[in-house]
Amino acid sequence: MRKHLILLCIMAILLPLHTTAQSFKKEIYAKPELSANNYLAYPTPSGKLTPPPTGYIPVYISHYGRHGSRYLIHDYQYLRPLQILEKADSIGVLTSKGKETIAKIRRMYAEAYNRWGELTPLGAEQHKQIARRMYKRFPSVFKDSVWVDAKSTVVIRCILSMENELQELIRQNTRLKVRCDASAHDMYYMNLSDKKLMLQKETEEVKNAQNDWDKQHLNFRPLISRLFTDSSFVDKNINVGQFVRDLFSLAGIVQNSEIRHSLSLYDIFTPDELYSLWQRSNVWWYLHYAGAPQNGGNQPFSQRNLLRKIITEADSCLSLPHPGATLRFGHDTMIMPLTCLLN
């Protein structure tokens, strides 16, 4: 008698947590794109899967995944640093590196114009590849005419991620029965907005913890001097921390769109600066979405409805002769607290 194995898949752009600080610093030195945190373009898995226990076969997949690669969500994420550089250029206080940076950001802005936060072609391809890997690795789940039930948040990049993945699954097996939906009706668990927990993320204690870390670990003056020739202009006109974070976001997002083939902004930064900014991003995510004491330690419970849904739908599907798969397409801001809630 064969036993059944349930697979719970939580997919995100996360790197192994056991990686030591020094080894990861070396990896960033070798490949700057790894510093991009949640903007890291989803890397194609290359490891070998752990085989199921003897006598077990996979019969059901329950999945919550982030959308694929996207453009930055807001126009000001491009315009805010660009306008600062343009103002400096207009009065002649930019270095040659600063002038190069203006030209690059203008190209990025043009590529993303009116596509703020939308899925890129790379993002669509990522979900097609995920579908192919799932089908190849778990044929017992997707055999014959089983049901695949898919839900997305109402955000277009998530909907298109879902559609690209489902279309590829159907290409692999035209007999699959697929149903999909993206509705405000399901947002209570697909992307819960808990006002009380949201306020706890923005307390003075959280802000002070972030500011204290920044003061101890960050020094952006050398970077600023590579872009501007006049320190008084910088002091009077620039919020240096925000400006550098904007540049770091732009540098990280490049790898997610087609413009990655023709430009990079990582030449602005030293490897040590990239490592420090990567660390800062980790601190920010921990303070806002994990069980940090500064936020009351309750942020993982923002995904309580999603976890309940995963459990109840698994119970329901496993009562069927052929359970199939339940696929959910959402955001990284759900995945981190969900992972913490699952311990």
Task: Name each model feature, range by range.
Residues 1-24:
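Bacterial Sec-dependent N-terminal signal peptides
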Residues 22-147, 153-325, 330-343:
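Signature for phosphate-centric chemistry
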